[in-house]
Amino acid sequence: SPVGANLGESTFESNLDRHPTSREGITCVVCHRINKAYNKVSGRLALVEGGLTAPVFGPEGNAGVKDVLDKPEQFRVVTEEKEPGRKIHNKAEVFAPIKSSTFCGSCHDVTLFNGFRLEEAFSEYRMSPAAAKGITCQDCHMGKIEGKPSGYAEGPAAVIGDVPTKTRKLTRHLFSGPDYPIVHPGIFPHNQKAAEFKTMREWLQFKHKEGWGTDKFEDAIPAGYKFPKPWQSVDDRYDAREILKEQFELLEFAKRARLEVLRNGYKLDDVVVDRADVGGLAFRVKVRNGTDGHNVPTGFTGERLVWLQVTVKDRDGNVVFLSGDRDANGD
């Protein structure tokens, strides 16, 4: 992650041994502690170091932060590290490039040290009809609808202690993509309660698919069943299950957004049957790019594989042809 790179962590270091902030991945600071336009640098950029109360950089400047700081009795925030209360950055400085597609290109165009072009989403965008029309990366990926230039919602930028800030333009920060999480749900999405409750190594030992922490499992534990040391306490297993319930809700929310961006990015025309007789069946379907912002698929060179799952059934519902099908794990 950019944080890990700034901390000097080795590329080959296990995530289990990285700094906790590095393991969080792409968080607020990766974009909002940048004060320089790097252009295409393959993500090799320097973050402005500082604690929680240090200034951040954004498109709007300090008006919103100042309004909160001017009402300490209402928002109960503090800007000193040692002062008790809700800590907040003491200033938001204007950084206009963060609104541009070039800012996204700092990371989303990757050339390896040997010159191999690993990812070129930004280069594709620069040559696209969307770029010619002035549509930015942010317009499609931070607007109302995932993957479409759909305008922006309005509302409070933050809710501090149940008190909303002033209404303003809202940019969506979910950044959905086609990625499918395969990490243990106790580890991802990042959850502060989960991180404080158990280490990553311990979470990897929690067999949530077997039902640990549910009444169905706990009331019928087989004789001689052995738990790893971190999970020998039934209370810990139930507490872990409560955390995972929150995680599964977040994963389901992310899934809906992921499918939204995929459905807007890929369009399937109607199936055209070229032949259907005793000699066989032949058909075709056109897959189209639903966006004019970049290629589909885009992303990393090694991941640019797309196939269709095709199932043909007879009149009785029996499967007579199957292609591109997945196993029980969805692979």
Write out the residue ranges for each language-model feature.
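Conserved, well-structured interaction surfaces
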Residues: 2-10
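Primarily the internal scaffold of c-type cytochrome electron-transfer domains
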Residues: 9-331
